[in-house]
């Protein structure tokens, strides 16, 4: 099960209390104090592990607590420190103070380990309180309490390419034919109820991560449909691929404009990311002239049909691609507008190489 948020209380361990004891040895009358200190309470850490991609291990749990330190012992022996608690989270997890909404940590890198709460110090044993006036002190200190924090975890997926489109436009099919992801695929809206990640292999040595984000509808940025719950997952994507369904009752330009608007309303920064456009389901087109419809869409974007073919695009239908060999990459325009079919694999390999090249434009 994909869980992208969790709320619970975290407590570090309490320090163990000090010990009040006295030396008891043969021929030693009224031995001096030898009570040891209490052990330190366990710390709480966060550890980022890219072998997990969900917060499901925290589902239904309200409290996580590190172990308390053990009591000190005679013979000036310090009590055992409490075991630390390590909370394992996937990359992209934010740790948020549930009372103030302050983002405490943004955990991105695999292997990153953060000390979150330190355990309480152990109390001092009576050996520390001997003085000239009191040779046999019975006083010892209790351990200090651990720290308590009410937190919220929120997972925002990290991907190189995020698929943005209406429900049922072919995003799940596209990620299934380009990567190792196995999303549910069916002919109804909101098949994808949780984000899916897939690794796209480009040639023998290169790859990138693609995210299938649940479909966006009009008003998604206001919380309609699956709304803000899933729009947040494209916040961390480096590049956006707008997937436009040519077999949809909505026109291509209408789909594109709504998607761009919803992304911009959700995050102005996100709307400035590099992007490209895939015209999907050309195998299911039922209009009069797909070639003319694609040409008109390219014109409506104030672009011109391309003749250059660096990526060896199929040429049955028109396409657009920025010529970065003789001119600079223009972030305000799509890197390419490409008709594809996940069913027949039309332009699929070319799409993978073009996306990989687009990811390199920011390097």
Swiss-Prot record:
Its EC number is 3.6.5.-. Mg(2+) binds at residues 172, 192. It is found in: Cytoplasm. The lineage of its organism: Bacteria, Pseudomonadati, Campylobacterota, Epsilonproteobacteria, Campylobacterales. Residues 159-360 form the OBG-type G domain. GO terms for molecular function: GTP binding; GTPase activity; magnesium ion binding. An essential GTPase which binds GTP, GDP and possibly (p)ppGpp with moderate affinity, with high nucleotide exchange rates and a fairly low GTP hydrolysis rate. Plays a role in control of the cell cycle, stress response, ribosome biogenesis and in those bacteria that undergo differentiation, in morphogenesis control. Monomer. It is an enzyme of class 3 (hydrolase). Residues 1-158 form the Obg domain. Its cofactor is Mg(2+). Gene3D superfamilies: GTP1/OBG domain (2.70.210.12), P-loop containing nucleotide triphosphate hydrolases (3.40.50.300). Keywords: Cytoplasm, GTP-binding, Hydrolase, Magnesium, Metal-binding, Nucleotide-binding. Belongs to the TRAFAC class OBG-HflX-like GTPase superfamily. OBG GTPase family. The gene is obg. This is GTPase Obg. Its main location: cytoplasm. NCBIfam families: Obg_CgtA, PRK12297.1, PRK12299.1. GO terms for cellular component: cytoplasm. GO terms for biological process: ribosome biogenesis. It comes from Aliarcobacter butzleri (strain RM4018) (Arcobacter butzleri).
